[in-house]
Amino acid sequence: MHDSGGVQMARALKHAALCLMLLPRFLLAAVMLWLLDFLCIRKKVLLKMGERQDGPDDPPVCVSDSNKMFTLESLRAVWYGQKLDFLKSAHLGRTAPNTEVMLVQERRQVRILDCMKGKRPLILNFGSCSUPPFMTRLAAFQRVVSQYADIADFLVVYIEEAHPSDGWVSSDAPYQIPKHRCLEDRLRAAQLMLAEVPGSNVVVDNMDNSSNAAYGAYFERLYIVRDERVVYQGGRGPEGYRISELRNWLEQYRNGLVNSQTAVLHV
């Protein structure tokens, strides 16, 4: 009895400590969402964000006037995303989490690192069809895939919906998809993604959302894994989700390969 009570107390204290650490950042995000419901402020903020974008790889985020930003569902989503980011096990320079996913076309369970091919970098692109920034930048991601397919491999990991139609709904989402109740729901949603990026490797997270949790991927996020270690960790979406950073990393990696080959030839 005493041991059980001690375990419960430890869990309660751990949860309380987590809440205290996340609270300042969460309150700041909540205030920002509240301010964004004033359309004059929303337009100014989006305009400033658009000015900071790095060309066609990162088109600006669009938020229609009809979308409510400060709601109970939005606060839940923000808290959930911040909690996943804080508790994630993926960190720059460390071993990449080898979580279970399912291949969409083959309907077969694999682990993320099974998709690596030798020493080639593996790019992980986490997102969902109900996430407007992710879908808006999907074309740019495909351009990167086609331009760097000779030196790297790419994997789209379909996670839980960012803006489900029965949650924090967004009228800017190209698809209105409810929360996934089973793996079949997630596979059906991923088929829509596959139609958007034909020929791409698409997998789905399991219903425990283990990949999403391990990589802190909600709402969307980019990672690069090489030699089973995280060598690039993108920021949390939407603000930190930048295809331009992915392109820059791959360009530097390609230049490094060319320089090493040139050095070998000179020797």
Swiss-Prot record:
It is an enzyme of class 1 (oxidoreductase). The lineage of its organism: Eukaryota, Metazoa, Chordata, Craniata, Vertebrata. It is a single-pass type II membrane protein. GO terms for biological process: hormone biosynthetic process; thyroid hormone catabolic process. InterPro entries: Iodothyronine_deiodinase, Iodothyronine_deiodinase_AS, Iodothyronine_deiodinase_I/III. Its EC number is 1.21.99.3. The chain crosses the membrane at residues 16-36. The active site is at U131. Residues 1-15 are cytoplasmic. Monomer. Homodimer. May undergo minor heretodimerization with DIO1 and DIO2. This is Thyroxine 5-deiodinase. The gene is dio3. Belongs to the iodothyronine deiodinase family. It catalyses: 3,3',5'-triiodo-L-thyronine + iodide + A + H(+) = L-thyroxine + AH2; 3,3'-diiodo-L-thyronine + iodide + A + H(+) = 3,3',5-triiodo-L-thyronine + AH2; 3-iodo-L-thyronine + iodide + A + H(+) = 3,5-diiodo-L-thyronine + AH2; L-thyronine + iodide + A + H(+) = 3-iodo-L-thyronine + AH2. It holds the Pfam family T4_deiodinase. Its main location: membrane. Plays a crucial role in the metabolism of thyroid hormones (TH) and has specific roles in TH activation and inactivation by deiodination. Catalyzes the deiodination of L-thyroxine (T4) to 3,3',5'-triiodothyronine (rT3), 3,5,3'-triiodothyronine (T3) to 3,3'-diiodothyronine (3,3'-T2), 3,5-diiodothyronine (3,5-T2) to 3-monoiodothyronine (3-T1), rT3 to 3',5'-diiodothyronine (3',5'-T2) and 3,3'-T2 to 3'-monoiodothyronine (3'-T1) via inner-ring deiodination (IRD). Catalyzes the deiodination of 3-T1 to L-thyronine (T0) via outer-ring deiodination (ORD). One of its GO terms (cellular component) is plasma membrane. The keyword Cell cycle does not apply.
